[in-house]
Amino acid sequence: MAAKGAKETLVNKLGFKSSSSSSKSAELEVEKLKRENQQMKKSLEDMKRAGRHQHTHPDTDKARLLERILALETLREKNNQQLLGREQEITTLRQQLRSAHGEVVSSLQSQLENKQHEAEQRERQYQALVKETEDLKNKYCAVSERCDTLEKQKGSSGELAVVQEQLRDALEKNQHWLVYDQQREAYVQGVLARIKDLEAQLNEANQALQQQHKEAKSDDQSAQKVQQELEAERNKVSRMQMEVEDLQVRYEEKSREAAQAREQLLEERRREREDRKSSVERDALLQDQHRKREAELIMQVNLLQKSLMNQKEEQKRMAILEQQIQLSAKESENEKLDRQTLQHQLHKVLKELRKARDQITRLESSKQQRESRFSEPSSYNRMDLERLTIQDHMTSPSKVHNILDESVLECPNCGASYPTSQHRELLAHLDYCFT
């Protein structure tokens, strides 16, 4: 009876039933932790995918804006090339105007019409470019506001709230896991201490049994049974030790898995931080690029405005030139009329000169005849000589020259005056002056 009571006390002290139930509960908790780790991994992958989808939308909008800006830059370069070509054409036309004297008015009018058409086209292009720049500015402001709203909504959107809740759950589960690890370590240490206590109790029981064996040699059979029971209990204790070792191995494996999961979480957090930093840097670079492009576009707009002002000034100058050309045309017409009148006057003067020449030749011939007559004194007497002298005085060439000197001829070009007696000098002067 005493042996049976000692056996029951040993069994109660060992607590085999509680150990088996605790091992099952530990396995169930380990499986739950595995499932929770898998769910956390899936949630993190979903977070990554959602973050990538969120980052792609503004990037596509910004890429479209960049393509539009490049297209505008190509148009600007084409317009600059066209302007250079037109300026070259204007220079060639000016040279042609300088070279050609008879076709000045028609060529200038055609050039003015072309320039007016070109100025209208440039104004239309400038207005279109201004509208496009304003549209781009509005789009850029909308994109920047959208990026700001997306950055602000990152903390308030439903998906991010779910992800944050999942992260909080993961952190809480990690804390529970740490508490469970600590509890398991305390449990294992308690089991080991209990095993040590049981071994001490077994030693004490062995010593007590030996003492009882010495005291009661008659109860050999009961002692053998007790020894068998003790051996069975020792086997059970060894089994328990094996189970504890298995639990320790499993605990180490679970702790390794938990450490790996922690490392993965840390790496994912680092990656998310790096992605956020890279996205912020990209946004900053894009904003800087957009600002630079806006500054360039503003400079281009200013240059176009200056060019338009220059064009307007050129138009004013061309209008002044048109007026001057019209005045020159009128003056040329007036000069033509003056030339025609002068030519008519010259024809009249030449006719008069011819008449005067004829008269002079006649007078010279008559003078020669008279001189020849005066050379024969025998045929004339004194009275005849007096008559002839009187007639000579009346019709002398000096008098004729004096009559001719009273009428004056003028050069139509420079206004130089010559008497009619110097008609030959006037003709030489006209040849020199008009050449």
From Swiss-Prot:
The keyword Coiled coil applies. It holds the Pfam family EABR. One of its GO terms (biological process) is cranial skeletal system development. Its main location: cytoplasm. GO terms for cellular component: centriole; centrosome; cleavage furrow; cytoplasm; Flemming body; midbody. Residues 1-63, 213-239, 268-287 are annotated as: Disordered. The keyword Coiled coil applies. InterPro entries: CEP55 (IPR038926), EABR (IPR022008). Residues 26-49, 213-222 have a biased composition (Basic and acidic residues). Transmembrane segments: none annotated. Disruption phenotype: Morpholino knockdown of the protein increases jaw cartilage disorganization, decreases the size of brain structures and the lateral area and convolution of proximal renal tubules at 4 days post-fertilization (dpf). Embryos with CRISPR-induced cep55l null mutations display altered craniofacial patterning and atrophy of the proximal renal tubules. It is found in: Cytoplasm; Cytoplasm, Cytoskeleton, Microtubule organizing center, Centrosome, Centriole; Cytoplasm, Cytoskeleton, Microtubule organizing center, Centrosome; Cleavage furrow. PANTHER family: CENTROSOMAL PROTEIN OF 55 KDA (PTHR31838:SF1). Plays a role in mitotic exit and cytokinesis. Recruits PDCD6IP and TSG101 to midbody during cytokinesis. Required for successful completion of cytokinesis. Not required for microtubule nucleation. Plays a role in the development of the brain and kidney. This is Centrosomal protein of 55 kDa. It comes from Danio rerio. The lineage of its organism: Eukaryota, Metazoa, Chordata, Craniata, Vertebrata.
